[in-house]
């Protein structure tokens, strides 16, 4: 039976970076430590494909019992189950600043997930309010679009694209709550995009629909023209939402 998922990259046993399976195998005699999954930190082992390429890949040593979103549908999204602390004045200012820069934030999200529309964006904001996302003291504006991508869970492919993949985003295993972002003693977290085939018999994809998992950059926020490609309908829809939210501020 074919083992899944098969990864080309793993966390380096010693250095703070990803390592390709071929590099890992080449340097194996010099390495002290195990390759680990960047999403769950579980131990990986190397297998060789039984096809013409005979290429090497990483698979989870625990097989189907791995507690990893790449392997099991039962693994919860850690960011979605941890509620933030009570809102402070800083938190309210962070939220107000987010609303003032909403176009830039939406454009940042669309650089990574082009199907993310205004309705999904406003839904993510409401979800963030429920989770008191703004209350985490280390949360920075530049990270908020990526947090919203992770909180959104499955992002459906556009209805007119039959071959398009569904998307899902996860931070690396070091980010178990939003408060883990932005800490002064930690390195930049990694964000991963999981692509899934469009399901035929179910509402959402499962691990059996997984196509691949790739790291995506978290640098788009500083390079965007905030008003580029936003339609008048986008602006009107968000302004209506913002007016409604102003009457019921986050608590």
Q: Can you annotate each of these PLM segments?
A:
Residues 1-251:
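Intrinsically disordered, low-complexity linker/tail regions enriched in polar/charged residues
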């Amino acid at each position: 039976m074919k083992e899944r998922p098969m990864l080309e990259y793993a966390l380096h046993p010693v250095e703070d970076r990803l390592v390709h399976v071929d590099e890992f195998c080449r340097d194996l005699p010099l390495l002290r430590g195990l390759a680990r999954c960047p999403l769950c930190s579980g131990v990986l082992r190397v297998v060789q494909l039984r096809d013409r390429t005979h290429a090497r890949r990483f698979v989870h040593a625990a097989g189907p019992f791995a507690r990893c979103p790449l392997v099991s549908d039962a693994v919860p999204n850690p960011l979605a189950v941890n509620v933030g602390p009570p809102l402070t004045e800083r938190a309210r200012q962070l939220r107000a600043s987010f609303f003032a820069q909403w176009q830039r934030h939406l454009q940042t999200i669309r650089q990574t997930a082009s199907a993310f529309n205004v309705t999904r964006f406003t839904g993510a904001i409401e979800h963030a309010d429920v989770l008191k996302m703004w209350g985490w003291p280390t949360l920075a504006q530049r990270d908020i679009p990526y947090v919203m991508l992770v909180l959104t869970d499955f992002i459906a492919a556009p209805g007119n694209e039959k071959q398009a993949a569904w998307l899902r985003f996860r931070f690396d295993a070091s980010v178990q709550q939003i408060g883990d972002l932005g800490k002064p003693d930690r390195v930049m977290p990694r964000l991963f995009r999981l692509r899934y085939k469009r399901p035929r018999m179910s509402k959402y994809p499962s691990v059996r629909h997984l196509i691949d998992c790739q790291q995506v950059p978290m640098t788009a926020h500083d390079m965007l023209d905030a008003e580029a490609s936003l339609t008048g309908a986008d602006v009107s829809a968000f302004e209506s939402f913002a007016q409604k939210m102003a009457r019921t501020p986050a608590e």
